[in-house]
Amino acid sequence: MKLIIFTGLVLFAIVSLIEAQAENEKPCLAQYQVCTHAPGNCCSNLVCDCYGRYKSGARIGRNCFCLQKGVIYKRED
C-alpha cells in the first residue's frame, strides 16, 4: 500500500515538473507583434511599447507592439 502511494506521489511530481517546464518555454512575441494583453512576452531584444489612440481629443483605445529597445519612432506626415 505504501509503495502504491509513493509511486503515485512520484508520478504526480514528475507530471507537475513537466507542465511547469512547458509553461516556461512559451514562444516569445517577435518584432511588431501585438503585446497589448501580454506585455511581458516580447523576445529578449524587444520591449512592449504602448500608444494611446485618440479621436477628436478623446481616448478610444490603446495599442501595444513589440519594438526594438532604445529605438524612437516618430510620426511622418
Curated annotation (Swiss-Prot):
Residues 21-26 form a propeptide. Expressed by the venom gland. One of its GO terms (molecular function) is toxin activity. Transmembrane segments: none annotated. Keywords: Disulfide bond, Secreted, Signal, Toxin. Its main location: secreted. Contains 4 disulfide bonds. GO terms for cellular component: extracellular region. Residues 1-20 form the signal peptide. It is found in: Secreted. InterPro entries: Spider_toxin_CSTX_knottin. Belongs to the neurotoxin 19 (CSTX) family. 08 (U8-Lctx) subfamily. This is U8-lycotoxin-Ls1e.
